[in-house]
A protein has these predicted regions:
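Short, C-terminally biased terminal segments at protein or domain edges
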Residues: 1-125
């Protein structure tokens, strides 16, 4: 088991979730409150939640499986933000900031999954 609060990928995912809650969700149109806004909310907090849940598992294999789920959620968030950009709910500038964060989290998750699946050989995360 790992202390998830010490994991850089969790820290980044947590800050991203806070950013989405504070800066993106409040500007979403009212008509999307029970549809797209809820889906973005769930997918966004699913990323750090899966990291947390996986960190409580006893094996690297199990932890990596939860990180796979977190990675899937990043892909879901990635598309949701393409959609709200194309619907003009957010500006291109806001999208670029969000997309950069999502890509950083994805890269961190992929590296961590590889690290766990390779038996922690020759790498430090």
């Amino acid at each position: 088991m790992r202390d998830y609060q010490k994991l850089d990928v969790w820290k980044k995912a947590h800050l991203f979730t806070l950013q989405v809650y504070k800066e993106i969700l409040p500007i979403m149109p009212v008509e999307e409150r029970f549809a797209l806004t809820q889906q973005i909310r769930r997918a966004t907090y699913s990323i750090p939640l899966n990291i947390v849940e996986g960190s409580g598992k006893n094996t690297d294999k199990d932890f990596a499986s939860y990180l796979d789920n977190a990675l899937g959620s990043t892909k879901e968030v990635e598309y949701a933000f393409i959609l709200i950009r194309d619907l003009a709910y957010i500006s291109l500038e806001v999208y670029d900031v969000v997309n950069k964060s999502v890509n950083e989290i994805k890269a961190m998750l992929i590296a961590f999954i590889k690290f766990l699946r390779n038996g922690n050989k020759g790498s430090t995360v």
